[in-house]
UniProtKB/Swiss-Prot annotation:
Catalytic activity from the UniProt record: 7-aminomethyl-7-carbaguanine + 2 NADP(+) = 7-cyano-7-deazaguanine + 2 NADPH + 3 H(+)
Enzyme class: oxidoreductase
Coiled-coil annotated spans: none
Active site annotation, chain numbering: 194 (thioimide intermediate), 201 (proton donor)
Pfam family for this entry, one: QueF
UniProt name for this protein: NADPH-dependent 7-cyano-7-deazaguanine reductase
Amino-acid positions noted as binding NADPH in the UniProt annotation, renumbered to this chain: 94-95, 262-263
Residues binding substrate: 92-94, 233-234
Function: Catalyzes the NADPH-dependent reduction of 7-cyano-7-deazaguanine (preQ0) to 7-aminomethyl-7-deazaguanine (preQ1).
NCBIfam families hit by this protein: QueF
InterPro entries: GTP-CH-I_C/QueF, NADPH_dep_7-cyano-7-deazaG_red, QueF, QueF_N, QueF_type2
The species this protein was found in: Shewanella oneidensis (strain ATCC 700550 / JCM 31522 / CIP 106686 / LMG 19005 / NCIMB 14063 / MR-1)
Annotated localization: Cytoplasm
């Protein structure tokens, strides 16, 4: 059994986070509420450097509780689709993101464009990387789609499970080198825990790959082994990507997870070495 070394226990970068602490909610705009976490914390642990990442992609956020005041003081509401580049120096800590968005609630903005530009500026500065923001107004709420992840779901495999500790070695000897395939698989059984609070994070994951055929039972056991694992969403997806590359020798690979929302936000990390994210559509559990 592989021991799960904790690279975060002494990380000074996590000590000042508001996550897991009692917090006062501010209703007037304050960009300083945003807090970033260096991506290097996790990437160092899985032997990745910013100069030689094996993937591209984005952290795709949906903010369902965006509200502000217009120039006349009338409340406005919207949904925001936000994409944060995988290459940014920091990921954005989700509780701080929620507190930051709440600070818009009693703040006047001249128009929608001012809200969008403020979000891009503040999030880019916190993440130290590229951010795009699309604001969806109420008149477009009715055309928002609920979809299923593409591919074949592996959750109905009749396996017996007794070990819930993270173990990438479930992927060892999991491929048939004589069968080279291109397929898309998915699972709704992904669960990990918040790195700071240990609250459960519920997700669905899509794995699209080309290469030796992966044993689906072993893949499902591997995904289930995240059940007691403490890491942020983005870190889990990058870990899955690296493990699949290492153990399964995928020639091409995409890992895309969509997590259920918390505090009005959902986080949907996307990592690939051959394709790019399309439109963001929520799943039924989101």
């Amino acid at each position: 059994m592989t021991q799960n070394h904790d690279p975060y226990s002494d990380a000074k970068e996590l000590a000042g986070l508001t996550l897991g602490k009692a917090t006062d909610y501010q209703a007037e705009y304050d960009a300083s509420l945003l807090q970033g976490v260096p991506r290097s914390l996790n990437r160092n642990a899985i032997n990745l450097t910013a100069e030689s990442l094996p993937f591209h992609g984005a952290d795709i956020w949906t903010a369902y509780e965006l509200s502000w005041l217009n120039a006349k003081g009338k409340p406005m509401v919207a949904i925001a689709d936000i994409q944060l580049s995988h290459a940014s120096q920091n990921l954005i800590e989700s509780k701080s993101f929620k507190l930051y968005l709440n600070s818009f609630n009693q703040t006047k903005f001249d128009n929608l464009d001012a809200v969008q530009k403020t979000l891009v500026k503040d999030l880019s500065e916190c993440a130290q990387g590229d951010v795009t923001v699309k604001i969806i107004e109420p008149k477009s709420f009715g055309i928002q789609r609920v979809v299923e992840l593409p591919g074949t779901c592996i959750d109905d495999l009749d396996i017996e499970v007794s070990d819930y500790d993270f173990n990438p070695e479930y992927l060892e000897n999991s491929t048939d080198e004589k069968q080279i395939v291109a397929e898309t698989l998915n699972s709704n059984l992904l669960k990990s825990n918040c790195l700071i609070t240990s609250q459960p994070d519920w997700g669905s994951v899509m794995i699209r790959y080309q290469g030796p055929k992966i044993d689906r039972e072993k893949l499902l056991r591997y995904l289930i082994s995240f059940r007691q694992h403490n890491e942020f969403h983005e870190q889990c997806v990058e870990r899955i990507f690296v493990d699949l590359k290492h153990y399964c020798h995928c020639a091409k690979l995409t890992v895309y997870a969509r997590y259920t929302r918390r505090g009005g936000l959902d986080i949907n990390p996307y990592r690939s070495d051959f394709e790019h994210p399309g439109e963001s559509h929520r799943l039924a559990r989101q």
